[in-house]
Amino acid sequence: MEEIENAHYQNLENFNDETSEDVNDTSDDINKNNDDNNKYDDNNVNVLDDKNKLENEEDNNNNDNMMIFSSILRYQRYKTKKGNIYFDFKNTNLSLNEKDMLVQSSNFYHLFDIKSLLCPHIYLNVSSHININISDYKNYLKRILNNDNVLDDKNENVKYSSCQEFIFEAVEQAEHIEVFTKVQIVKKLFLFLNQNVAEKMKNYIDNIPIINSNDYVLVQTNLKNDLLLGYVKGIKYNLFFEILNMKKCFHSFLNENIVIYEINEDKEGYFKTIDGKKYLKEQIVYEKKDLLKNLDFYSMYYCDYYFSSNSIIELEKKNNNNINCVNNNINSVNNNINSVDNNINNVDNNINSVNNNNNISDKITHKFEYNDYNDIHLFFSFNICIKSVKNNLFLHIIYNDNNLKNGDEYLNETFPHYEELNLYNKQFDINKMDKNLFKSNTFFINNLYYHLKCKLLCVFKFINMSDDDFMTDIHISQIKKRRYVNEQDSYMLYTFNIHTLSNEGMVYIFFCNLYISNMFKENNFEIRVHTYLHFQLNKQNSYKKLKLIKYSSKFLYSLCFKEKSDSKKKKKKNDHHERDSDNNNNDSNNNNYYNSNNNSNYCGSNNIIYGHDENFIFNSCDFNTLDQIKSGNYLIKDETINENFIFEVRNYKYTFILISSKCNIIIITLRKKKRKEEYNKKMSKYSSCSLNENVYMEGVEILNYCSSNNKNTNNIICNTIINKYNYEINNNIKNKNKSYILFEIVCFYENGEIQKYIYTCSLKNGNFEFFLNVKEDEKTKSINCKKCFFKPILFPFNEELLNKTKSSNDLVLYNIKLSHFKNLIYIYFQEKKIEGISLTINNECLIINYIKMVSKLLKKILQNLYNSDDIDIVYNFQHNTKNKCNYLSQNVNIPSDNTISNVIKKNEMDNNDIKYNLFTQREVKSSFFEFKYILFGFYDLFLMNQKNYTDLNEKKKEEYKKKNFINCFDSHSHYNFLNIIKEYINYDYIIDKCSYNISNDTQKKKKIKLNFYYFLLIIQYFKNTYTQEKKRSFFYMVYNELLQRDKYLKHFYYTYHEIDRKTNMHLNHNDNNIDTKEAKKNEETELILKNVNFYDNYELINIRKYDVILFCFLFHMYNFCLKQNGLSNDEFNSHITYFLINKKMKKYKKKYRYISKKKIDTNEKNDDNNNINVCDSKNYKGTKNFDDTTNNILNKQNESLDNLKKNMYLSKNNYDNQLSSYKNTKQNKTNINEKYNNNNIIMNYLTWKKCLYYIYKIKKYTRKIETHEGLYISSMLYINIYLCQIFFILLNILRINNTNIYTNIHFDIRKNNLDYFYLLILLNFYSLFYILISDQKYILHEEENDTYISKNIDNKEQMANDKNIISLLSFFNNIYEQNKEGMLKNDQNKNNHNTKTDILYMSSSGMNISINTPFLEKYLILIYNIIKDKINIVKEDNYIMEKLFFKINCMICNKVCVTNIYNNYYICENNHIFNKCMLTFGCIYKNHIILPTIYLLHDINDKLFPINNDHILSYNLQYELDYIYFCSFCYNFITTQNSFYKKFFLFNQCPFCNHELNIL
């Protein structure tokens, strides 16, 4: 990598030398100003000259619509101290100029220089950074808005003695930056400051890889320069460009006549009393118009920006004047830009937008002409923004469209996929997230050459606001579309409201109506605000933050009331309420969402269950099961309640305003009565806000005022978090008072302390009452920390903090006090979702969500197997699988001579051509993407913790090591699995049964080593002989529940779970009474399997035989790693912690490739092996006793399974009994604790029930998958690949496979801790790939093989036994013969060649022969065929998987470089390491993939190096790659340039884990 980087850098230096004059001509004066010396006064420049110069530079940029990059820049690190206030430029020779940009990233600052243009760079920790344009900021400090319109008294030059002094002031003045996630996918977008540079670089740009779609974000600064910057973060390139300059827009409005609403405080009071109830008094807004420059406001005050929680997208389709709302069904996306800016010549600027569900549409390449204007898709998108300056609020609309008649001169095509953007905007509210983290897109643009546009709508001027008062927080509600005011003129009405909070406690509520006429062509906006509400809090305090929580009375009643209600009536009202809450969805789409299956019972979003039939499993994945299982919190079908009471209650809307002051929190509860639509229409003449049901607040009643009354002035609140989805709820209080905890409030104080409050709702005499109480301290003392998205708290760690832990066990991070990382809780919740995700280290919340994710993945398999019309889809964007996927496989043509062409038919899967991907990443940002990173973050924290191990003395440590100590890379492996199962069956007896081909000699039996084949036999045997026992272990619970065999599984187990009879380990078929119909199905499936050419031993590794045992093991290991046996290896460094801990340690740079693994002591390793391979047999001393015991256990198995099934908590009849039994068990608390302690399990009752629920769902899903009616080979391939992908994801989340890239280069590749589960999944992948990829026309004839053997192979007998390897060598030989002459000319040692074996000799310098794509595909057929053959002989050669190696010549030293089937790297004799492609088994070197041959060890104990020359080729076959793909989830390198991959998989997703592939 260093060579590549240096090569690029040298070329770049030469280029920069040629163009240095052009680059630096416009910045000479500024370079002088930034010279780091004490002669600043002599080099000072006049302010007016700078201003004129800046204007001239802007004029030279052709027009204002040209976006400007800072550049594509390489970082250089500078020394910093804690607090980010110190800079040291002594080690650099750079000077600051207008092209430089300073970026602060956590504890590091990066200075970018234009001279390093297009060089690769590393950008660490982008989650929190400040973006400062140094020259702009400096010029701003000089000018301070000094222009004709805005006068400023301070017109002095700012002087700095050094650059450091300037940066001090810049950093102190800077605020955090708003960062938004991807808006649109960008391909090869580069803009340059200089036209000459662009012309000379255009040829180089064409070869730059495509930027990954996840790397596009928008950046908004809170600096006084008011910039909205676009930011594209790639692996190699960081792009900054200007999207919107708020300051320029603001100055453009100075001469406009704008609407000014004067807010004058009403002296008569804020309230009015009607019938004894207190209401907020409606106030009058005084409206006037005036020039903005005449408005008296203070520009020197700090300003801030607030945005609406959603954006609106409107669309007008071809030849249709009607505006269509954007629905949520995701379709394809496409946008192709064929025109570029005048300053960029011939640069490829294709922008392909890919939606969040991996949909890629066909390209539309027609060019736009003005006469085609009526045929294009017009779109209009906008968001509301408020700029707060002292006592003025400037209300802006920021919008974007593709209307070419409004001044945009660039070409435009069909706007990409509106539904996708609309879906993104609905999911997030950027104002509710920390400002230093990634945000959702608030703005989006169709074409990056189009600026966002801004329009000042009005100004709110607060007349009576005191000089010391100012706005501290503003909340803008969601923008909602109401109706057409005038359909002929396209006059549309949108409504929203604004809540403001001032420092002195004045709260204002404004109701705004936005009218937009002819939005696609004219963009005419009109804002109307007629009335507002306000009230005053205690002026003695200062108030900081304002947050809103809204509930309906119907929802509150469903939580608090204990009685039951009619489900059908409830369902109807609930659907109507949900449709009203989301205005952006059309009626037809909502009908599909809620009524896709009229015959099935619906599980509502308000904790309501309507049934448990078979269709229920499709509907019950995404509701709050925790609330559902609580007493009195569920509604059962066919039970009645007073309908009038429900109707009366649901007429109210409750709003809870949470206000935080210096030391206290205040909650104000408001209630408004909903008006009917007819009444709203009548009132529309008098008040514009009456049309908005959710905004209109006439008759707003104040119900309650609560305060925390904290008297401790030292507890200053720095932040508050509202957790609306609380896991821990006191059921006893609810049963007595019909009360319920609405939400939990967590106050974080500056001194590091935390205080929790709960806001309770109770129902008394038909009315709701609300209380704010202090939450009692929990026994676990868990800490809630809201860090939204996938940036964990791990990132602020550095060497200094970690070193401090040696003397102190406490760390203070983000004002959160942690101890040993044991009680860290990460809470992530999403708006309008019933259930939040609470992740912890030391209790069950984490394992529950882990199992929940498996349930969701299994549900996706069912959605692909069944017709979307037959199931009720929970996510509406998954509603139509055909629309989502059919274009992916429209052109899939399977060759006629394919071995499976007679079985796979087009449109076989219910007319849905589905690719072999589960779309795990691109759905909802909270479903899988962040979940993965959250798990990694917590796992890393836990790995660094020496749980209860550091406190032991030396003697106890030795005892602890011998008994319980497990190395971190052994705890996940199959060895620990054997430690689990040997508790239930005798290990020696297993070996005796499994190794049937070995004599019964005890001495020989002890020498048997575990291999992959024996491992498969063991887990088969364990699965068929494991029985229920009264053990309260997690593994026991999961296994027995998933293993329950009901009537649905008879056919499945009979067909697919046949085990080799030689081992006497077949299933007990006594209970599988199969009828005649099922027998016919069995015969049909057997014929299909024979015709499909499933090779001999595929049934041995079939993943569907091991799904139960895999699920159980993975769940258990996850629970095991996080709860019971904390990993005590402090030397293990994960992929995250490596960059945080070891960056200054030079000794790791050469010794390790990425991360080192702990060295294992030989004594310790031998002890572990002895413990594994030797197990005392107490219960099973002989074969007879063992068989008798096994028969007795099998006879009792079904009874125990039935009992467990009856006791499942989802059973409606036994739920109350279980709850009562739980209460009884509480009385015997001491006995329960003793029993739990004996089994190392301490579980909370509610979380245990919830965990059981998801395990139950997994069982239901697997039953449906296994009993799918379509027993065709295609369906089997789909199911098996999907299951492999699920298990592969789980394995990587757990890091069970320790064969990743974090390896020690001195580590023996054969001694790597092979996880046989990992190998089992990989072999399933490769076997299934072989079935898909096999094509007989590429297979070489046997005659060619024989000829090759006679000519080139000395040991003919041995090699002739493996014809597939000979076919591969013959393939190499044919290519060699075609390129032989060229190789001989270039070979310096050609005189030493052996004429007999031209290609089988060791050359002093390796040579590479390039091949094309057809040869690569032939190679894939051959290499997969060899792997298939090796799997077929696993019974005859039990160690074949350990003996199989891939080999090439090292590209550096020409030594032999090898890898095995399960490692993802190559290593040579000189410890040179190269990446390996897990799909083609090739070695990735630079921009090529080197194709290996197969090498088999004769004996597993033989030395790997050196390899005899007879097995070494003198050259490598290489294939040039356009791009190299890297999966950031499973750390595998994937090369996808072959037709096979394009046929059966999504091109930009990893086939193993479905994660999006990044381009290196």
UniProtKB/Swiss-Prot annotation:
Keyword Coiled coil: yes
Segments of skewed composition (Low complexity): 583-594
Protein name: Uncharacterized protein PF3D7_1223600
Taxonomic lineage: Eukaryota, Sar, Alveolata, Apicomplexa, Aconoidasida
Keyword Coiled coil appears in the UniProt entry: yes
Superkingdom of origin: Eukaryota
Source species: Plasmodium falciparum (isolate 3D7)
Annotated keywords: Coiled coil, Membrane, Merozoite, Transmembrane, Transmembrane helix
Acidic residues bias (residue ranges): 15-28
Coiled coil: 36-60, 317-359, 1188-1239
Biotechnological utility: Possible candidate for an effective malaria vaccine as determined by epitope response in sera.
Signal sequence annotation: none
Ranges of compositional bias, category Basic and acidic residues: 29-46
Membrane topology per record: Multi-pass membrane protein
Transmembrane segments: 1271-1291, 1314-1334
GO cellular component: membrane
Subcellular location as annotated: Membrane
Ranges where the record places region Disordered: 1-46, 568-594
